Amino acid sequence: MKKIITPLLACLLIAGCSSAPKTKTETASCSYTQEGLMTATYDLTAENNDITVLSLKMIYDKSMFGDIDFTTITEDMKGVTTKVEIEDTIIATIEMNLKEADPDTLKNLGFDFSNTDMSFDKVVQDMKDQGFDCK
């Protein structure tokens, strides 16, 4: 009996020590609409409650375009991808990989996350408190 239990316990010990901690991935999509002006949708992805990817999609009435400056957005920013579509509406999409993007680059785009609690739960709750519909 001892000969069976000892190898079994050794296997369990090895299996327990070699397992990596699980990464908890969460997502949320939060939208807000100002009738006749714009719709903003934030898509959030988090690992272990830390936001890793933040995507912002803004849809404006074409008449609002004069108030938006997209000249600072370029395609070569590490961790930031952008897309602007102009038809009957203006659709601007900015996706930021917060693990890769340079904080100064984000500041230049108007996204200053320094001294900000970027935990998934906090950001989603703050957005709900500001009137966003989060799913």
PLM region spans:
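Hydrophobic membrane-targeting and insertion signals
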Residues: 8-9, 19-22
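Subset-of-secretome marker
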Residues: 21-135
